[in-house]
Amino acid sequence: MGYSRFHLADLQVHTPADPDHEYGEGWSRDPDPAFAEELVARYRRAGVTVLAVTDHNRLDWYPVVRGAGERAGITVFPALEISVNGCHLLALWEATERGHELGRRFLAALWPPGESPFDSTGHPRVVSRGQVAEVAALAVEHHALVLAPHSTAPRSGLFGPGVCRNSDEVAQSGLIAGFDVAGGPSADVLVNPRRQFGAVRPAWFVSGDTRRWEGIGERATYLKMSDEPTLEGLRQAFLVAETRIRLPERLRSRWAHVRGVRFLSDPRPTWPRLTHVRIDGGFHDGLAVELAPGLNAVIGGKGTGKSTLIEILRYVLDAGKPVDKDAAGNRKHNFRANAEAGVYFVDERGDEYEVRRGGDGGSPLLLRDGQETGLAVRRRVSVVVFGQRE
């Protein structure tokens, strides 16, 4: 069991397939595993763990970048960047073979059969079917998450001057999940979004629009998702941007004027906290829970052991006795002499410990690196527990 955490993501990454790339002359437009390995390695060094490969009008680079990402611990989503009458859109799919196939089906629907999405020089052509809202709706029908890249750019952004005449209708349609602040930092929509969005709160983010080695990872966004990012996790982040989207603190000087944008210096917790609970034996036998550094909610129906789990934590951490005698009896009944629990925590200095105690009533043991410390548990951890009806 895991918890939601902030992942640093760049959702607009181009490969040498892009005619305007500046990675160097040695790379081919065709998928190259060596380039993919170098790309994800550089992102990994920059702390980025989520990518979307967004080449114009093509998806063939996705498999090699995804493979390199799997080896480097980076989640890679298949995606497209397309131009609809000059307005650019991004469409992202689930990071699976099915997601890749859905993207290919969507791409095939954008031009008549036999018509190439590239011109004679290899440059991507604009979509020949539909307006911005219609193409965005088609992408959603193909299970894509649609974003507006460099949305304030003068010649290609949704809110760029003269780019999309009905940008307000598109912005309020619900078809586009997020809007990239990049393009024109002085754009009015960034400080006065109501003129375009009405009562809708825009989900702002920033991406790299990466085409060169220099600056990789500098323009990226923290997105709060589960420990294994999914397309649904991305969708939920954009739906609840006020709690799940943050720009890196280093970008504050550039984008602090954007209404609604929040910043984060470091997602890693610095306060004392419980980190894991492991129980062997008894009612909760085999339970292993990774605790979030903030609020944790234990959810379940009646009789599933929620209150008992709280009482086990109280008991193992030697945090006193419950006021309710039934609570103590419940713990003894479900956490008997053959059961043992370990509660792991990090103190204010960042040192990691484990408290281990069996259900036989013996004293709790404080361990560090698997070795007993000989110290009383309360010397290193103190918790306040309010059980049921307390």
Feature-to-residue mapping (PLM):
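Short beta-alpha junctions and helix-cap segments that line functional grooves
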Residues: 191, 324-331, 369-372
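Surface-exposed cleft-lining segments at the edges of enzyme active sites
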Residues: 115-127
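Nucleotide-state sensing region of NTPase/ATPase domains
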Residues: 332-387
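Active-site glycine- and acidic-residue-rich loops that bind
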Residues: 124-129, 157-160
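Phosphate-binding glycine-rich loops of NTP-binding sites
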Residues: 292-328
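Charged catalytic cores and adjacent phosphate/nucleic-acid-binding surfaces used
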Residues: 1-37, 41-42, 46-48, 60-108, ...
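Internal, conserved structured core segments that host functional sites
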Residues: 129-148
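Active-site beta-strand/loop signature of hydrolases that rely on acidic residues for catalysis
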Residues: 49-57
